Amino acid sequence: NPKRIAFVEGEDMRVLRATQILVDEGLAKPILIGRPLVIEKRIKRLSLRLKEGTDFEIIDPNKDNRYSSYWHAYHQLTERKGISPEVAKILTRTSPTIIGALTVHLGDADTMICGAIGRYHIHLDHIRQIFGSTPENSNELAALGVLIREDGVLFICDPYVNPNPSLEQICQMTLMAVDQVRRFGVTPKVALVSHSSFGAGMTESACKMRQATAWLHANVPDIEVEGEMHADAALSEVIRQQIFPNSKLQGQANLLIMPCLDSANIAFNMAKSLWNALTVGPILMGCSKPVHIVTPSVTPRGLVNMAALAVVDADSKLV
């Protein structure tokens, strides 16, 4: 049976185009959160062949018989986080992201995609409120950007979630990213990137990446990981061998762990533009449920790619 995907921005034309592709290819059963009349008019404007009830379901924030159970569930989850019953009622009517998250929490959807409209961290805050993280990930979430080119795949972590990750967070996000890279059928080759190469710098950031590398070498010796190093050394074995011939990393790194959100986001968006690469994600890692946040620049095909990944994610999290 196709997995049920709740699309938070159900009225968005990109979401509607993606819904048509998902239905045509039998990849998922979309659930669109939005006003039925608006969705119907836009389907006609786009000349799509979608039929409510047959191809997709609509959750109308203004009129849905699950409203009472949803706001009660939301209040139960957040009553010790400053959310009163009245506020819970209002937010469950007015926040599509909260509604979408509750569909997954209550079993009405298998996975959720949001972020086509609005700021990433607002969506992230709602997801953290309702789901949190898996116990094995020590309450940490992180994002992974994926760049696909003809000559291979490059993963960059963490371009969206953690502004200035601690040593412990760097180690944890590396382990999560390694697991995600393996799900793509790729053997991870990890570089912890810095302005410093192999002990040359003594800034707090360089020391953090150096210590994280040492921890990874000691605790997960089966992972091919090296650091700290410049980005050019990570991507060129020739440069790396000139600087540090005894590197544990062989060949070109395909997973770059960045010291902060600024460096990761800049690198990801610069590489995306310069290489004209196909992007997947960002993939939200560490969440207890298979939910993901895209960005406002996402295309219909990007939403389809994210939906396909979310379906696989939902399958892997089935108990």
For each feature predicted by the language model, list its residue ranges.
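Anion-binding alpha/beta catalytic cores of soluble intermediary-metabolism enzymes, centered on
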Residues: 1-319
